[in-house]
Amino acid sequence: MSYHTKLYDYDLPPNSINQNPYRHPEDSSLLIAESKKIIKFDNFDSIISQPSLFIFNSSKVRNVRIVTNKLSGGSIEVFILNIIDEFNARCLLRSSDKKLIGKKYNTKNFNFEICDIYDGSYLLNFDISIEKLIDEDGLIPLPPYIKDDQSKYKYYNNVYASGGFSVASPTAGLHFTKDLLNKLNIKNEIIFINLDVNIGTFKPMQVEKLNDHKIHSENYSIKKADFKKIEQAKNKNKPIYTIGTTSLRAVETAFLNNSLSGVTDYFIKPDTQIHISDYLLTNFHAPMSSLLSIVHNVYGDNWNHLYDYAIESGLKFLSFGDAVLFKIDE
């Protein structure tokens, strides 16, 4: 069936966007989609009725945003999208001057040159290690709809984040504290996969038909032993909870491609069959986000009514907002 992307446009009031993170993540709210019941996230473990398998994305947001001044005058911002090798990276570049191949920039702490120009991004060659640049000069990149404030940075990574190279957080995990994870681990199994979230996650759909939208590509990896646990859970009819759309896309890709690592541009549409997950926990997504296609898939045509209900109930949306739990019917 052909779907129009205008189905995924809705009115999101500015005051429904949580500009500030929950200082205590357990104070956030959880909407249980099936019953429309709203609970405090701290009580999440109480609704897990039988031993289950939980899949989290542990990819860590790196300090990829570098804001500095050119020695010649004027500010400059470099946003590292992905590292090619020790000294080369694909980046976004914000500077008032004309950007041409071969142009060199000098700053107090580092220098770089434009080696190639892509569609909206640049291949930059730096005179210092990019890892050193990230560690010494980088800032956490907050989403474009969140007002930048360094006091928010420490709340934008999950408590279990480790490894990987994400430039945006898999934010469904932000609701989980170490205490809640420990409580879940008593009767359930927890595994961590890796999907490196890239900046394409924020790009709204700009075509008329859903099938014409090209979703962003992201690197993923799953340990062999952990995928074995997923297979065992399916064989035993043990419920599987994917925490976040990135976890869902990674495990579905691994299943369909019979590959535990690689690059995925898997686009879950309303009529796509979901093979692995029984439940999806996710935040509320922005209008025209391709992720709303997943919401449409797991909840049905009335997903927008559920979103209206969440807004009317005072729930908060987007990265620092509240969460919703979907039961995925076969």
Feature locations, PLM:
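Surface-exposed, charge/polar-rich loops and edge strands
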Residues: M1-E330
